[in-house]
């Protein structure tokens, strides 16, 4: 078993909670950070039921709050981050784009600042295929997989 401790942001969300289960099942120590705006503490209870052990480190925190996030890093000696924390509803994002920008972009920047100040150099960033747009609009498979020269919409 490794002494590394991974922070999973958005760890109470769907993908985050499944990732936490796999990490725990592989003997990796995990700290879950989630502001519960898109999820529920019930997910942590389900994780505990599945892995048959108590999840000792769940922290309700907004990743935009660098002071609180720094405290998480120093209290738990975080060695790597798997970053899932984000607002994700595409339709809603077109109605309130600044809130999405603040949460998703500013939150990621704050997280990266905290990683840097704590000398954490391992981060896995997750996003959505929707950021690439619809490449099927070209009417053939010339843009699948998406090449770097693919035109932006």
From Swiss-Prot:
Residues 1-153 are annotated as: Galactowaldenase. One of its GO terms (cellular component) is cytosol. Pathway: Carbohydrate metabolism; galactose metabolism; Carbohydrate metabolism; hexose metabolism. Gene3D superfamilies: NAD(P)-binding Rossmann-like Domain. The keyword Membrane does not apply. Keywords: Carbohydrate metabolism, Galactose metabolism, Isomerase, Multifunctional enzyme, NAD. In the N-terminal section; belongs to the NAD(P)-dependent epimerase/dehydratase family. Mutarotase converts alpha-aldose to the beta-anomer. It is active on D-glucose, L-arabinose, D-xylose, D-galactose, maltose and lactose. It is an enzyme of class 5 (isomerase). Its EC number is 5.1.3.2, 5.1.3.3. The keyword Repeat does not apply. One of its GO terms (molecular function) is aldose 1-epimerase activity. GO terms for biological process: galactose metabolic process. It catalyses: UDP-alpha-D-glucose = UDP-alpha-D-galactose; alpha-D-glucose = beta-D-glucose. Its cofactor is NAD(+). This is Bifunctional protein GAL10. It comes from Candida maltosa (Yeast). InterPro entries: Epimerase_deHydtase, NAD(P)-bd_dom_sf.
């Amino acid at each position: 078993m490794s002494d590394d401790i991974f922070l999973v942001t958005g760890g109470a969300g769907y993908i985050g909670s499944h990732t936490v289960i796999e990490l725990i099942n592989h003997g990796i120590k995990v700290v879950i950070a989630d502001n519960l705006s898109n999820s529920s503490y019930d997910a942590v209870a389900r994780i505990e039921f599945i892995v048959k052990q108590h999840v000792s480190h769940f922290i309700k925190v907004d990743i935009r709050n660098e002071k609180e996030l720094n405290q998480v890093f120093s209290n738990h000696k975080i060695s790597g981050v798997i970053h899932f924390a984000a607002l994700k509803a595409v339709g809603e994002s077109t109605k309130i784009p600044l809130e999405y920008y603040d949460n998703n972009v500013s939150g990621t920047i704050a997280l990266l600042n905290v990683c840097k100040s704590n000398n954490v150099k391992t981060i896995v960033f997750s996003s959505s295929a929707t950021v690439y747009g619809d490449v099927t609009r070209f009417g053939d498979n010339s843009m699948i997989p998406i090449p770097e020269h693919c035109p932006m919409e």
